[in-house]
């Protein structure tokens, strides 16, 4: 078949565009008009990605409306008007160095790479410029490009690197294109966009902007590789989770106290590209962190986590060069993916005085979440409030618990602080009794951190007091660029030698130009490539050494040991980002010959010690399980009392009882041919085998919070009647998690005769052969993607046998539903290719965010395509729904997989 493919292309032009450059700030004065407004007419500018308005009177608020519209570098089109958050503005702490020269300002707004701006400000009472603060200007911030970002093809949206087209963003965000800036910022640009229908075009103004570029280039040092390890069961010492170095104790620098809570991985200022030359005065310190205040940065929720470092650089430049602060105001920042960034300089383990909560900075630490969780329903168009993700809430809780743990603070308790100034909530000198973890609005007259984030503070406090506060942050991001990465296992490649192919995620989706193929012959990979090893039969991501990078666990059930035990099986762990060091291990505690360890693999922090552990299962002699904890301890056991082999094991990780420890659910077919699911409960000492569910197993299993109640739920793919009691065409069953484990209350089973589900139940379709869980529409409920690789499809009156289909099922507060389900096949409009006999689309599925925007995208394995070479179909999830017309195909020619390797039979996550 002939089809459109994701062309890796030539990267020469893109590499030129991705040039390193420093942060710059451009200031444009606003002028009074006869309409009683202050305006900046449409103006061509140098590149910027973040903007705001500021004024010279720090103590004065802008009582009115400030609006901006910008021109996209990528499309050349003008955006609609966007309101700036002027209500969030607050005066700088008088103790802040240089506070006497500070300016007032709106919250900065991230707009993505732009090269034109228009702005208008009007007083709330319509009194014109006399009712507005003095010295109003528009401030444009170009966050620059670091050396590491310049080299990362995943951050290229020029069409050279990614599989998609870049329309996932909704903002035309392209860090690389921003290097192409207007040579003359005062020139009159062409206006491909148009004003709103009720407006007449505004002539281009010609102001003389005052540029305030930083002199020191922004450069991110390369992340150091994990320490090497031999191909032995002993792991290497794990590195520090952050490269931030605190200053040595001195008369002005305190000693960092130990914490009762493990420090989470933090992206240091050096790593995200802070320009220290712009910080005039050294850090100041408070006596102790008695409280933690949670903030939001307002602005936008439409950013990729690959852009978070740019956003943080932009906020730092705005705080320093626009508002006149000494440094970034917050102590820490957290993005929608749960990445934690070091904020104000001075040492993350020290009590650095921030500038985040006016009146209470002398007693607290400030954590800001990137995003707007208040919204503005009165804006035109209305601006919706964002919903904080689970990853965000848990990372905020980890940081809060760690900082409070240094000083004996209780994250669920209360604290009494003395207000240092009038804040609109408290009078100067008043004793304020607050929750130890509070929102900004509890201390200062503001909407911050927004209604939706404020409403989740109780959950942050709960998690900060649970075992989860010490747990590893779940990740599939091998190089820590903010985007999850995909792994395709091909265990049958090269006569059963086996291989895995890593396809990095990017702003446009998967980046085939940066793919990596690994075998046991690859440098640094333990073991040797041998026929029948089936290396890659199962894979899993997890931060196993605690450095913040995802590490890869690979199962090889056909591995023979050196003592003559055939098919003993093994698991290999490779440390990210390089994946060229690690260790491997085999079975213990069970019969070695035929054990086939590595038939199923998953990873999670079972003992909540800050490092992910590895769970593996083997099929030999009734089946067995093996949990490899990060201290090298191993837990093992059998699955059944039979001496015959089990089959089709598949494992998933989730916190099903919400106690903060990762649990495991293992699916398999027992020796009697019946599908089973066994629950292993996490705890301080690792995993405990709890029970086998009454609900039958099938061929696939996945976990996620489908009903949005905070407990991970179990999703079981049940394609066959004889194994699972399923309908003839297969089905998907969701089993809710609760504080005591799983329950059948609220359980839902969906098949193709369920109302709302496309198609019809037909014998042999095998719906549920593969399942994956993720939130494709960012509504807070995990959705389910299920494969039916044996689905027959009729096209042009001709039936095709087993071309396959995938069905997207939606999560709701009531659980899994068939309502609104979406089917995708190669006959779906917009999807390249066409259905063919035995293509088997849906042989594997992955519902994973491969762009960093928070919505999980669809990756569909089609293992039978091209006579068994196999392909992957990538379908982006956009703000308006599935981007079917942007579907890209990744095939043998892009990924370099072996002939007849059946690419698409296994996908991780």
Summary of predicted features, one role per range:
Residues 35-47, 66-67, 72, 78-132:
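Beta-sandwich interaction modules
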Residues 136-213, 221-223, 227-230, 244-286, ...:
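Basic/polar, cationic surfaces and motifs that engage anionic cell-wall
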Residues 467-472, 504-534, 572-596, 627-647, ...:
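Blade-edge motifs of beta-propeller repeat domains
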Residues 471-480, 536-544, 598-606, 649-656, ...:
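Beta-propeller blade termini
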Residues 481-489, 546-555, 608-617, 658-667, ...:
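Acidic/hydrophobic-patterned starts of short beta strands in beta-sheet-rich repeat architectures
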Residues 486-488, 500-503, 518, 535, ...:
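Hydrophobic strand positions within the blades of repeat-based beta-sheet folds
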Residues 491-495, 558-563, 620-623, 669-673, ...:
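Short glycine/acidic-enriched loop and turn motifs that connect beta-strands
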Residues 496-499, 512, 551, 565-570, ...:
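A detector of repeated loop/turn-to-beta-strand junctions in beta-rich toroidal repeat architectures
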